[in-house]
Amino acid sequence: MAYTQTATTSALLDTVRGNNTLVNDLAKRRLYDTAVDEFNARDRRPKVNFSKVISEEQTLIATRAYPEFQITFYNTQNAVHSLAGGLRSLELEYLMMQIPYGSLTYDIGGNFASHLFKGRAYVHCCMPNLDVRDIMRHEGQKDSIELYLSRLERGNKVVPNFQKEAFDRYAETPDEVVCHSTFQTCTHQQVENTGRVYAIALHSIYDIPADEFGAALLRKNVHVCYAAFHFSENLLLEDSHVNLDEINACFSRDGDKLTFSFASESTLNYCHSYSNILKYVCKTYFPASNREVYMKEFLVTRVNTWFCKFSRIDTFLLYKGVAHKGVNSEQFYSAMEDAWHYKKTLAMCNSERILLEDSSSVNYWFPKMRDMVIVPLFDISLDTSKRTRKEVLVSKDFVFTVLNHIRTYQAKALTYSNVLSFVESIRSRVIINGVTARSEWDVDKSLLQSLSMTFFLHTKLAVLKDELLISKFSLGPKSVSQHVWDEISLAFGNAFPSIKERLLNRKLIKVSGDALEIRVPDLYVTFHDRLVTEYKTSVDMPVLDIRKRMEETEVMYNALSELSVLKESDKFDVDVFSRMCQTLEVDPMTAAKVIVAVMSNESGLTLTFEQPTEANVALALKDSEKASEGALVVTSRDVEEPSMKGSMARGELQLAGLSGDQPESSYTRNEEIESLEQFHMATASSLIRKQMSSIVYTGPIKVQQMKNFIDSLVASLSAAVSNLVKILKDTAAIDLETRQKFGVLDVATKRWLIKPLAKNHAWGVIETHARKYHVALLEYDEHGVVTCDSWRRVAVSSESMVYSDMAKLRTLRRLLRDGEPHVSSAKVVLVDGVPGCGKTKEILSKVNFEEDLILVPGKQAAEMIKRRANASGIIQATRDNVRTVDSFIMNYGKGTRCQFKRLFIDEGLMLHTGCVNFLVSMSLCEIAYVYGDTQQIPYINRVSGFPYPAHFAKIEVDEVETRRTTLRCPADITHYLNRRYEGYVMCTSSVKKSVSQEMVSGAAMINPVSKPLNGKVLTFTQSDKEALLSRGYTDVHTVHEVQGETYADVSLVRLTPTPVSIIAGDSPHVLVALSRHTQTLKYYTVVMDPLVSIIRDLEKLSSYLLDMYKVDAGTQXQLQVDSVFKGSNLFVAAPKTGDISDMQFYYDKCLPGNSTMLNNYDAVTMRLTDISLNVKDCILDFSKSVAAPKDPIKPLIPMVRTAAEMPRQTGLLENLVAMIKRNFNSPELSGIIDIENTASLVVDKFFDSYLLKEKRKPNKNVSLFCRESLNRWLEKQEQVTIGQLADFDFVDLPAVDQYRHMIKAQPKQKLDTSIQSEYPALQTIVYHSKKINAIFGPLFSELTRQMLESIDSSKFLFFTRKTPAQIEDFFGDLDSHVPMDILELDISKYDKSQNEFHCAVEYEIWRRLGLEDFLGEVWKQGHRKTTLKDYTAGIKTCLWYQRKSGDVTTFIGNTVIIAACLASMLPMEKIIKGAFCGDDSLLYFPKGCEFPDIQHTANLMWNFEAKLFRKQYGYFCGRYVIHHDRGCIVYYDPLKLISKLGAKHIKDWDHLEEFRRSLCDVANSLNNCAYYTQLDDAVSEVHKTAPPGSFVYKSLVKYLSDKVLFRSLFIDGSC
């Protein structure tokens, strides 16, 4: 073992010394491979030939500047400015490298010959002749092409293939290659180009005005433009001459004229505008239109050349969130933009941003200017006194090194000679550790004397200024000023005899008699400051006159804002709207509100057209007489003989009026349709409707749905007749698929020209010999169809098998009263159940066949229900009480019974909502149960072009019940159902995995022989179904046909390879297909589709996960033990133990990660960094954007680390963020509500549920507004409030719709981990003035007092000014032995979710309590459309409704609303106890009560984002309500208490003591440790990670009860 270690050590030492040959060979090989790879990579770079003669140093410059190219230097051509000319080729190639090859490119002022030589046929050059130099250059390029071609010809060569396309294009259409127009006026357009367009500008951008550049790029549809130009930082100094040493060129500036030339050459100079170049350097945005701008971004600087790119930006993506594309979208937003411009001062004109306002950007793009400052140098002529001034760039470190050193000189040593000596010494050398080294500052030696003078003057004047500030007195016979002059003369001696003259002329000093004033000038300015100054003085900012049309544009802007909420607002013709308002003299805001109400279906009518075009609106506004012209009629007959064969068409009946869109008086008819025979021999043209439905539907939503249903029947009949007429007109041109649906009989030959699949059609369309078309009811004999002599052909179809539509139209027409359908008052309950939840089983268990009715959509379902109901042998279900929907409507009134107690509609959501409303009305029932599945296949509109608005598809119900346990579906399908349904879906099936899939190579592979299919065969489409039936499969149906059915095994087949829209991840057809089986499902498909992906995901699920969805029903027994004592809490004093670390540990376990958040400077970070906010309409005063500085107060520092934040400083940004997150973030969830009627019903339930029966009517003998009520209100107010009312005379009402806005400085702590990912917004306070509160405060205080006295206090607690002890007394009589459901309704954004409906409910409550009508109306208008003003932050906005957080009714109003909301949704007659406080509620119900879908009702009716929780212990107002066998105890939330101990707003020790006392008051019950175990259970129910916390509860008691010990939780922040 020792030998092995020795050998290993020796080998390692040899390797380290380099003696190991194997390792050495491997290293050499590695080095060789690396070198080869590197050379190969370099060889793949683009190759550029550099033919001009340049020096070796210039060769190195070019190579280092452009490492992207492999440059070959030939040095075979002498030329002027050789380096610059050669670099121009490299610059061109570098720019073209940025552009995708083959994309249309515009070379602005470019060299078209270079592109031809490179074979770039996709480049167009704009080469305007702006001076004679340009003409000469263009001719030179043509000569180079001729020279190249002549060389090829001389050598008998042809143009290479890569150049041929470009040269052919130049020879055939030279204008496509080059034009002599400026880029702004170029007319070239390459029509065949479909990709993005690019542009380059190589040293040509100087000649394009910067203000026109963006528009010119947009006109050419340029996506990105790459540019290169010469520039030098020194141009921003006061120097008139700047050298570009690397390319031996120079800039000369004379005013705005900037000349570029090459040194020591006689070539012509280039002249440009200095201000124009400065714009390209400094500006970031170049506007192209009112929507798009080009944003400049610098890329790189190489050899005095700056490269940048201009990218096209769509600003609508920034402001709107999505890009709106439409026919008239540009017009709409243009109008919005115009209104904005007039409304806001210089809205976008002054928004021009200078990129270089950021110092870091200046240092990056001007690297030579980093740490450099501009220092002035002065000079003056002794003869003429003419002053001169120039500036130089000097290292900032050099300047302060000199100043700091010479400021230490004594007065006698501070001479110009000493300063010059020091400056010269540190410039020439520096001594480091006794060794002389070269100076780090490379300052021009010719400037040292002038710089020394500047340093000396600055230091001398600074010293004198300090002395003058101290000594303002005379010294002997000389004044102070005289002493100063003596000192200066003594310092300079005879070298500068006119120092005084110089100082006076430079205005460095001022002399007035004997008084001397010295002003020390700024020694330097930074390059960044000079750059901004030069730009602002050189560029005139645009000015816009905003005074004209202010009032008109304000109104139009508000109207357009109102219209912008429409879904298709970008397609609304704004110009027509504006002209309409002007012509008709209509207020635009009124017109806009009407349009929004109509288009949003909030006006009591529905417009069915898809687009709000002028034609559609005009049709909707036609009067009834004009609308009836050309309408559809049904001709009836006079019965001349018993047979229908000789019927003739006489008289008219208006079918269009069936929908109720025209009054009864407009009908033209001989008689009512009393039988189907009156359809016989009706002309086909009378039944074919060009207008599918009414344009306008009026009335309640149920009435509109019923009218739409009648119109759908008319449209279906019209479509069927129209198709039959088409078949008769062109029988020979029918394709194979159409032949399967139709039949055509030739009457003369009695032969079917097209044989129908079915027989015995009920009706058809006949063609007479006169080529007239009529509808005929068909009769049959032993020879077939009975015909007339005048008939030529008869056409039938699958739609004419029964009289369905005709019979239903006849029945529904009888039900109309004055053209309006009757709406039943019966209660409608929607039972929403998942597939297989037992809806049919539930119907059979509930139904009483003697008095109830069951309706189903299809015959199979009806027979199945009859079979199951009569399975016991007793016939209960008959044709009278179990019927199909069509049968019930068609044969209405013919049965033995016409009235039923309850109606059960199975799969009711597959029906037209209007049909459901008719069924409820026709059955005369008291309550109707509509069973369905909101996620499965809904009603499908089969008539193309018939309008079925989205809000018509939503059934109107009074109550919703959910069923979320499936008895059919296996566990894997249950997992899929949980993704589609809200709530937890469970199953009872023992089958876990049931689905599989098989990819079939082609449709022909599926046949009964080679591919027998197991179980029920289903398809998605009718075509696939017919294909399978034709191949020999039996019992095949579509998914839509078997909705509601159950099968053990299912084979699902797809033969169609083309995309099918109903096969999608969220398609209801897929849901139905997956949920029909109980054992297995196999999917056979010819293509990959979303269903394959779903099945593959389900196949991968683990059995452990699937076990979670299993429900086992069992019997549970509860052991009950009665206690000896009841009525009082057992008290056990809590021991005072524990430490600070206990509280920290508990907090970290409950809210992990919160204590690690360093959020002390979050507010500062938000103010200093860029922020993007989505703001609704508001007015901002940016003069308030910088808050007034305040003396910082250092608060006490908590020892317990929590998520508490520092107090925020009120300001524009902070207040705006709070307003956006609070007031501007209100949800919009509610459906269509009849506000007044619904509010009245809700208030009825409120009074019935909460108020004592004898006190439900107001006491009219008590005055609400009297001296006593005012005095009671004043007793509760502070002296400051009363003082504000000193000048109020109570004569007139202030503006009740005006509110003030403010924020709370301290953010509210949340007991979750959201602080780790979001910036918590402050709570907003919106409040009235004290004058308004003085009027309505006493009034609502009295109303509140009367209401609370009327509440049934034995069952309900309205938590207003109640103590924890009173809460314990209220819940103290709960019987813990009685099983209870404890419910909590959690509502987010409670205040901001309240809308017009909530206001209507609250006002109705106050009205019934006795609120006077006038004051009630004033208060109502003051809460409708309100104006908010934040004077501190400079914000003004308008809000509709919403609860005002600082209102006199804020607390009691919120309490009343939450109570009314729960009363409308829950059975309050069963409640045991209920408590309400603001948005908090706690309800105790008996175990097992059925509750509706609270979330659904809260969303649609109350606009609340609500969740209903079932708890073991209640949580109310930050307290845990622990009920036990002796009563009830209320514990303050210990986690909330610990969170407060991390407060960072405690000012001083006195404030801390007040804080401790307030905590002691609320946490007093923690002193009783008898129920700590129940408290642990309650906390763990809310916070899953909370450990048992008795140790921390005792620690809290210990610190809260000891004043001195409590101080140890904080330390002094000022130390």
UniProtKB/Swiss-Prot annotation:
Entry's EC annotation: 2.1.1.-, 2.7.7.-, 2.7.7.48, 3.6.4.13
Domain RdRp catalytic: 1380-1493
Statement: the UniProt record of this protein carries the keyword Nucleotide-binding: yes
Reaction(s) catalysed by this chain's protein: RNA(n) + a ribonucleoside 5'-triphosphate = RNA(n+1) + diphosphate; ATP + H2O = ADP + phosphate + H(+)
Positions annotated to bind a ribonucleoside 5'-triphosphate: 833-840
(+)RNA virus helicase C-terminal domain: residues covered: 964-1116
Recorded GO MF terms: ATP binding; ATP hydrolysis activity; mRNA methyltransferase activity; RNA binding; RNA helicase activity; RNA-directed RNA polymerase activity
Keywords: ATP-binding, Helicase, Host-virus interaction, Hydrolase, Inhibition of host innate immune response by virus, Nucleotide-binding, Nucleotidyltransferase, RNA-directed RNA polymerase, Suppressor of RNA silencing, Transferase, Viral immunoevasion, Viral RNA replication
Superkingdom to which the source organism belongs: Viruses
Signal peptide residue numbers: none
Positions of transmembrane segments: none
Alphavirus-like MT domain location: 72-281
Family: Belongs to the ssRNA positive-strand viruses RNA-directed RNA polymerase family.
Complex formation: Heterodimer of a large and a small subunit.
Misc remark: This protein is translated as a fusion protein by episodic readthrough of a termination codon. When readthrough of the terminator codon TGA occurs between the codons for Gln-1116 and Gln-1118, this results in the addition of the RdRp region to the replicase.
The protein, known as: Replicase large subunit
Species for this entry: Tomato brown rugose fruit virus (isolate TOBRFV/Tomato/Jordan/Tom1-Jo/2015) (ToBRFV)
